[in-house]
């Protein structure tokens, strides 16, 4: 499996020095920066030959899912996907954009849950149609019930994914949220070929270290059992600092890499 990390582009040298294969960007940030800063990002990526295979932060903070028009979604995705795929366009094909955004998809009080699901499914289809043009696949991220009230488990994400019924709409498993919701590993088997991406952290949301070897081996085995060929991104608390967290991750990296 290829290993990446949700990381600040200014520190990509730290990933490159440790054998990482890619970095995971923030899509909303990437879409919102100036052309000048985007060129700086491109220069750093080229310097270290490390590019964003994936992006999280699909929606910006001001984008409320149940208030957006299809045109707004199309325009946003066109800009965001265009920028993402310009980075390393000659080096990699087929990017992943993680659809998390607990606040963006939070169902407002009194709002119909059935209607919320209809809007979410349609929004996924609209974004995925833009994704077709850029070879970008959406990965629905379940978020634990303390962070949102909609799509908390991988089982729920799979249900939504199947309703969207689009080749560029798939699912992600984030093992922190998976752990929080006490989902059984058998759900990974249920996901099968619909699993497009993985976020990895320890059960306490820190970057995994030697103390997490046993649980990380179990998660890796579950992925192997379905023939998972996708990538894995580190996403968690980089404490006490990025360098120390990366060094502590080395033994776990050997499990997945």
Map each language-model feature to its residues:
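Histidine-acidic metal/acid-base catalytic patches
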Residues: 1-19, 74-75, 92-94, 151-173, ...
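Short secondary-structure transition/capping segments
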Residues: 35-38, 65-67, 109-111, 151-153, ...
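Active-site acidic/histidine proton-transfer and metal-coordination neighborhood
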Residues: 47, 66-170
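Catalytic-core regions built around general acid/base machinery
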Residues: 37-48, 120-131, 187-190, 218-223
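A short alpha-helix capping/helix-coil boundary motif
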Residues: 19-22, 59-62, 104-108, 137-140, ...
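N-terminal pre-domain/capping segments
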Residues: 1-93, 125, 166, 193, ...
């Amino acid at each position: 499996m290829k290993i990446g990390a949700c990381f600040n582009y200014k520190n990509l040298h730290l990933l490159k020095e440790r054998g990482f294969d890619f970095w995971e960007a923030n899509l909303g940030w990437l879409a919102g920066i100036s052309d000048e800063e985007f060129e700086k990002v491109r220069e750093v990526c080229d310097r270290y030959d490390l590019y964003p295979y994936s992006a999280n932060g699909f929606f910006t903070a001001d984008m409320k899912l149940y208030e957006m028009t299809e045109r707004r979604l199309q325009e946003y995705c066109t800009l965001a996907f265009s920028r993402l795929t310009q980075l390393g366009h000659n080096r990699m094909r087929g990017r992943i954009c993680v659809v998390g955004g607990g606040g963006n998809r939070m169902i407002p009080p009194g709002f119909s849950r059935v209607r919320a699901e209809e809007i979410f499914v349609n929004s996924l289809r609209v974004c995925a149609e833009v994704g077709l043009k850029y070879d970008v696949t959406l990965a629905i991220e379940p978020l634990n019930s303390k962070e949102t009230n909609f799509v908390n488990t991988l089982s729920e994400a799979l249900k939504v994914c199947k309703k969207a019924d689009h080749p560029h709409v798939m699912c992600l498993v984030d093992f922190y949220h998976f752990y929080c919701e006490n989902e059984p590993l058998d759900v990974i088997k249920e996901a099968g070929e619909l699993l497009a991406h993985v976020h990895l952290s320890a059960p306490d949301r820190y970057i995994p270290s030697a103390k997490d070897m046993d649980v990380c081996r179990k998660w890796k085995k579950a992925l192997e059992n379905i023939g998972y060929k996708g990538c894995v991104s580190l996403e968690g608390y980089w404490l006490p600092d990025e360098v120390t967290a990366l060094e502590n991750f080395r033994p776990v990296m050997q499990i997945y890499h």
